[in-house]
Amino acid sequence: MSKAKATADKCLSNNSRIQSLLSQLEKVNAEPLLFDSDNTRYVTAKILHLAQTQEKTRKEIAAKGSTGMEVILCTLENTRDLQTILNILNILNELASTAGGRRINALISKGGSRILLQLLLSASKESSSNEELMMVLHSLLAKVGPKDKKFGIKARVSGALNISLNLVKQNLQNPRLILPCLQVLRVCCMNSVNSVYLGKNGAVEILFKLIGPFTRRNTGLIKVSLDTFAALLKSKTNARKAVDRGYVQALLSIYTDWHRHDTRHRHMLIRKGILQCLKSITNIKIGRKAFIDANGMKTLYNTSQECQAVRTLDPLVNTSSLIMRKCFPKNRLPLPTIKSAFQFQLPIMPTSGPVALLYSMPPEVDDVVDESDDNDDTEAETEAEAENEESDQLCKNDDIETDITKLIPGQELGRTLEDLKMYERFFPELTEDFQEFDLVSNEPKPGAKLGPIIVPTAGEEQPEVPNNFMKDLEKRSCNISLEDECNKRPTFLDMPKNVTNKGNDGLGQQVHGDIDRSCYYFSSDIVKDLEKLSLRKPSGNHPCRNGCVSAKDKPIFLPHPCNKSTSNSGSCSNNLFEKHSMHLSPLCCSGITPDDDESSPLDELAMREITDFDNLLPLHDPDLYIEIVKNTKSVPEYSEVAYPDYFGHVPPFFKERLLERPYGVQRSKIFQDIERMIHPNDIIDRVVYDLDNSSCSAQDESEVLKFNSKFESGNLRKVIQIRKNEYDLILNSDINSNHYHQWFYFEVSGMRTGVAYRFNIINCEKSNSQFNYGMQPLMYSVQEALASRPWWYRVGMDICYYKNHFSRSSIATGGQKGKSYYTITFTVTFPHRDDVCYFAYHYPYTYSTLKMHLKKLESLHNPQQVYFRQEVLCETLGGNGCPVITITAMPESNYYEHVYQFRNRPYIFLSSRVHPGETNASWVMKGTLEFLMGSSTSAQSLRESYIFKIVPMLNPDGVINGNHRCSLSGEDLNRQWQNPNVDLHPTIYHTKGLLQYLAAIRRTPLVYCDYHGHSRKKNVFMYGCSIKETVWHTNANAASCDMVEDSGYRTLPKVLNQLAPAFSMSSCSFVVEKSKESTARVVVWREIGVQRSYTMESTLCGCDQGKYKDLQIGTKELEEMGAKFCVGLLRLKRLTSPMELTLPPSLIDIENELIESSCKVASPTTYVLEDDEPRFLEEVDYSAESNDDADPDLPDTIGDFENTALEEEGFSDSEITRTHTSGQST
């Protein structure tokens, strides 16, 4: 007890003692005439002793409300006694050294910076300045300066810059004194005006004298000198001066010397300081030239290679990489023009916009490169990483609409009712009386094709498949290590297109003798197990197609002319894909050489096995697909069919995880690119594929890969062989455009096994990609398909996305200069020799595939239950029809009451695929269509609840011709909804007309949803429209929370968040942006008056939450999302009409709470995406200069704010999630 009391007394004594000492100083400051130097010296010495020994003393002096800091600074300002000044400076140093941030800020707020600079000025005027005073004073200024934002200006105005610089000049041999002086100069150089001022006064030359070759002496001084020198060189004037004096060569020599002698890596910071100086100099053009002339590329490349083995030297490797990439000469794309290789003449010419500008350019203009390409003097201040720049913009989003008048929705049809009557014929359901229909009987009509098809949900396994088979299949498929015994397949023959059906028999006999038999070997276990994969019980008497070859007979492949001029299309495809044989038509571009020429008795078994996929692909008919392709009109007039589109895709039976990116992979790829300049003799640089040069044919050499993209939705413009197994690929621009390079779909053949092939797509435009965050490209192998694995699967290792050295001309960037393209690079080792493989950005879904699926759905549906109508809404610019679908339930009878109920069902309007490269939108739509046409109770209930009007492909021309974003008009159709042109944007004009017609007859849809894909976010989510949430984000109106708005727009997303595993409510946004005012979502909400108007975005990558966390998205999951959307609409009806169905009271209460949820929830905007793309441990910037802004020409690719929404209230779903439909999921 006495010990505690003694401690308390001691603390009290210490506190009272420091207060007493400060009171004495305060009295002296109040009465300057009574100033006693000895007493002041004694008091400050005592305070210094206490500050050095006791933390409580330091806290007391700087405590909030304490006058200790003011008293000490006031004493410093008034005294002229040297020892007193030194005592006070040391006191302040002690305060700044511990818990420095807060205490230094307190010192600055009391005017400490001004007092210290004045003291420096007065001390310099002394005839003989005290070295200790200057050292202590500069040491304190070096700590205060970084915390004072105006320190640089204060130092320059007070004249302190010259004082510090002169001290360095006069004391070059006194490291103890000049070290703190250099620290102060380093802080002052953060101000660009100060840097220029110091440079004019000889600072560049002085600092360079302090830098030298390897030494073990004064390393601290050398480190600070280098940091100060690097800061000084950020001024372009100083950098030019350094170049003129030959400092670039000298710095490279110094760096090499330190690298050679610092074998234990103890002086890594000095070596990095030298690199920082080079980095500052190479911000200017002459600096980059001097670096290259001094052989800097090779010097840094060699030293970096030696450093890569030591992880602690990564900062040196990264900085060296950044310098080399910056100095890598800017190259033009090896193209004659950046405009599309395909030309399409528009019916009318736009008067303004990018297309008009494109056509107004004289033919002689070189649009690939311009004089800006190597004139980008990059200021160091702008070299923040792109993620940080995006993060800074989180504070404010100027794109959010602030005009309340524009936010208030209202029906503005813009067309008269008479004009809109042209759309009456697309709504036969409103006038149909069903008098000619027999609706009394529930029995199906004779001859109708019935038999439900099960749509598999992504999370369900088929019970018919044995566990041992699934484990074995998953083990083999996940490793992509497929047995050699399944590699072999028949020869595919390329037949001349001018052969007619006449005389096929004779020609077939002639060819038959020349066909090499290919051997197959299938494990009997695989055969037995695959027979069980059918989702329907196989019919015992399944009829064979016309021309089908018996399973007992050896299949004979006959050539057939399948060009579009063939008169008898039916016979053309008889033998193309038969029940027990499979053969690509002559439309398929490439032949395949079998692995060996030996024949096998198991050929028959292999061919029979392929028939199982008829059951897995009920909506796929290769013969029908060929017929549809012949009538599909493309600008290049394609005459070939890609094998995956012909044969079909079955979702693999294994999950594909997001790829974990190995450390250092991006850096390794960058160094391989740098080697192109350092070792130019190793570069082959041979064009192996070129759409612009029809004479460029595939090489006959067996070591060279062969490429092709001349088929529907294909996109690959040019391929250049760089090294033996490395190829640069260039994508084609959208037609009538000079950019939008993202979608790719091409064929590769002639590969060898065990060889790692590197593919670089070098003209990408977006500043980042999900390829950096786990996404892989897709591959389809013909040999795998013939071995009963006909699916697209994720492939590729060492995948990364980074800025390259190919420059974008200002013509392609809307006037912005100095921008570069980006590279997607991936490495693939093919499992089969001489295979034919296809690569795609995402799962392809062509226009012909859509038409085939619609025809199959129509033929499979039950006409007594399902009201299905397919009509052509309009003809596109390219001459292709745009289908519009009507789906609902047939009335119970043709009695008036039932017909009246049929006609008065609310409308749901859906659309999809306005952007051709977003193929996932079509797969989601496929899931929706199959569910709606299904025979399950839920599907029937949904059809009885709504009339569905669906435009499944808004941009057929763009899809057909391999565009990524535009139609043939060269414009983004999703930016034309405000004022679509009937000649240039017919599909948008007439789709909007359908909606306007519904609004005009007072049948405004309950829900409108446009299906899209998102390339830079994970999960599935929705964008909606809300006045209140938009105003809330602008902070323009503090009373925005008092606004009254129906929160029903949130109901459907909340329901989907409960139903769909891939859906994420936290990624949804209901903010209206200015840049999105002409999109379908906003126009339908504002002009048509649909409150529940949405864009549903599906990831191209995968999920980071829920059931599919860390998995890449597949077609099974996408189709499941489409089906879950339908279930969500059924739940929406129950939520908005809870008394319509008999539900448990508890469920009704919870569902009502969902509707009444508060609108105070903050919703993210669609601006910046940070958490979805976290930084890597590997601190390598994917861009060369790290100064990328969001792409102005791609405003809709910008990410979202971090979600601040409250956690949504959930409820259990008792719905049956397994849906049985009359269309089978593929």
UniProtKB/Swiss-Prot annotation:
Q: Where is the composition biased (Acidic residues)?
A: 366-392, 1182-1194
Give the record's family classification.
Belongs to the peptidase M14 family.
Q: Which UniProt keywords apply?
A: Carboxypeptidase, Cytoplasm, Hydrolase, Metal-binding, Metalloprotease, Mitochondrion, Nucleus, Protease, Zinc
Q: Which domain of life is it from?
A: Eukaryota
Q: Which organism is it from?
A: Xenopus tropicalis
Q: Where is the Peptidase M14 domain?
A: 843-1133
Q: Name one GO cellular component term.
A: cytosol
Tell me the compartments it is located in: Cytoplasm; Cytoplasm, Cytosol; Nucleus; Mitochondrion
Q: What is this protein called?
A: Cytosolic carboxypeptidase 1
In the UniProt entry, which residues are flagged as the active site? 1097
